[in-house]
Amino acid sequence: DLVVTGTTTELDKTVIEQLVGPLEHILRNSVDHGIEAPSVRAGRGKAPRGRITFHSSVESTQVVVRIRDDGGGIDTARVRQAAVQRGLISEAEAASLNDKESYQLMFRPGFSTAESVTEISGRGVGLDIVQSTVRGLNGSVSVDSQVGEGTEFHIRLPISLAITRVLMVEANQETFAIPLVAVNQVARVA
C-alpha cells in the first residue's frame, strides 16, 4: 500500500522535476529491498501487504520529504560487508562503523547489496545519484532504520526553493515581490 500525505506542500516546478528520479529510486528501493515477502511478514506479526508512506511538509525553514516503509529494515552488517566486497572500505574501517555511519555507505558510488539486477530497482541508478541531486539543490538526505520495523529516508530542502506567495508592488518604475508572511497591512498611497 502507498499512503501519500502532505499533498499541499508546494515546491518550484523545476525542483520537482529534478526530484522525480531520486524519489522514484527511493520508492523502488522500498518496494524491492524494504518490503518483505508476505510469508516473512506473517512470521513477524505484520500484515501481509507492506506499507510505504510518502509525506511532505514545511518545517521551519525547510521542506521535508519522508519516505518510510514498514519492511525489514537495513541490515548494517550486510551493508558493511557489501562495501568491503566492492572495495569501498577496508575490513578494519567496516568494523569501526556504527549504524548511522553504515547507512552513509549506501550513498557511495558503486554501492549495492543486490546480487542481481531486478525489474523494480535495478536500473543502474544508485543512492549516490539521489544524494548528489539533493545536494545540488542545497539540501540533504539521510536515512534511519530499525531491523524488523522499517526504513525512513528524509530529504530536506531549503524553503527558498519552495513557492512563496508574494505581494507584487510597483514603486518608482521598479517592481518588488514582498513575501506575504512579512505583510501586516496594505494601504494605497496617493
Language-model features: locations:
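Conserved transmitter core of two-component histidine kinases
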Residues: L2-T5
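Short alpha-helical Gxxx[C/S/T] motif in the catalytic ATP-binding
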Residues: M106, G126, V130
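Flexible nucleotide-binding loop
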Residues: R123
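Short acidic amphipathic alpha-helix that forms the conserved interface helix of the HATPase_c
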Residues: I16-R28
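ATP-lid-like helix-loop hinge signature
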Residues: T9, K13, R28-K100, V147-G148
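Activation segment
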Residues: S90-A95, S112-E119
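Conserved secondary-structure micro-motifs at functional edges
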Residues: S132-A190
